[in-house]
Amino acid sequence: MSFKPLHDRIAIKPIEQEEKTKGGIIIPDTVKEKPMQGEVVAVGNGIRNQKGEIHPLELKVGDKVLYGKWAGTEIEIKGTKLIVMKESDVFGIIN
């Protein structure tokens, strides 16, 4: 099963935080920060304007992005955790 977001939504695979600190201390799940970076794995077709024309999204598959801590909805497809959100919830592309 594959996943294709609709309209102006994108699917992001979060880039997980390190399990250990540089000093070797293991960080438990209860204190880990929620990821705010990820890789775009799927994009919708775009959004319609008032004239009915579809404007494609700026983001593309493979872009590394920064997004809000509480943005989107978490889903799981074939054991892979993804976050689905609107393109406007993304702050920017990481180069």
Curated annotation (Swiss-Prot):
SMART domains for this protein: Cpn10
GO cellular component: cytoplasm
SUPFAM superfamilies linked: GroES-like
Keywords from the named record: Chaperone, Cytoplasm
One GO molecular-function entry: metal ion binding
CDD domains, alphabetized: cpn10
Chief location bin: cytoplasm
Localisation per UniProt entry: Cytoplasm
Listed InterPro entries: Chaperonin_GroES, Chaperonin_GroES_sf, Chaprnonin_Cpn10_CS, GroES-like_sf
Gene3D superfamilies: GroES chaperonin
Keyword Methyltransferase: no
Record carries keyword Chaperone: yes
Gene Ontology BP annotations: chaperone cofactor-dependent protein refolding
Domain of life: Bacteria
Pfam families registered for this protein in UniProt: Cpn10 (PF00166)
N-terminal signal peptide: none
Subunit text: Heptamer of 7 subunits arranged in a ring. Interacts with the chaperonin GroEL.
Family: Belongs to the GroES chaperonin family.
Protein name as it appears in the record: Co-chaperonin GroES
Species this chain originates from: Rickettsia rickettsii (strain Sheila Smith)
